[in-house]
């Protein structure tokens, strides 16, 4: 009887499943149905539109723009010839309980490149001696909107000093790169220091290649491998550590 009852229940489940699948099939026209092709096109276009909307939200949000800029820098650096290693998003300990977040460290035969990505638009004004730089926009009324942001050269100088303490070697060539997005205009950015580079992303590959050619090889393959192993753990941080870092930065650079 138990076996017979199980078989009856099993047949009932199959019938219910059959009705469910039949109901689902009825919601879409069959391949031979006159409206099948039109329905398929609507579904495909709907998926594409939703995907595009999600991409644009991610691309043009503050966080999304920052990540996009860093990803593009990473991709460009892979085109540089020679032995190399790339470390994105390094959280280097300062020794006081705080961390310095380096957008990207590029280990290459010609030295160590430390990148700060600023995927900004508008006009950019600043010099290496100013605490704050200015980003300007033209608004719809014909006026100008201005925003201040902390001197990225000073920001990257902090990153480099922390990196030098970790490496315990100040004799390695270290280059400070501030890379702005292609949608901005560097109107009045004055530099005097060597090893300082403030450029747009479209200039990055040419700049690094010229720099590598000028300085030649200063790091061996073994040097690069050792540096990579030393710094890799600083890219593996928890979400809680990232949140603590972001909170400290917001408090420190609040104007």
What are these regions (language model features)?
Residues 13, 103, 116:
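Acidic active-site catalytic centers that drive phospho-/nucleotidyl reactions
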Residues 1-37:
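P/S/T/G-enriched low-complexity
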Residues 37-100, 107-112, 118-126, 137-255:
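Surface-exposed interaction regions that form or flank ligand-binding interfaces
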Residues 128, 133:
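Polar interaction faces of repeat-based domains
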Residues 21, 102-103:
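Short hydrophobic/charged patches on amphipathic alpha-helices used for structural packing
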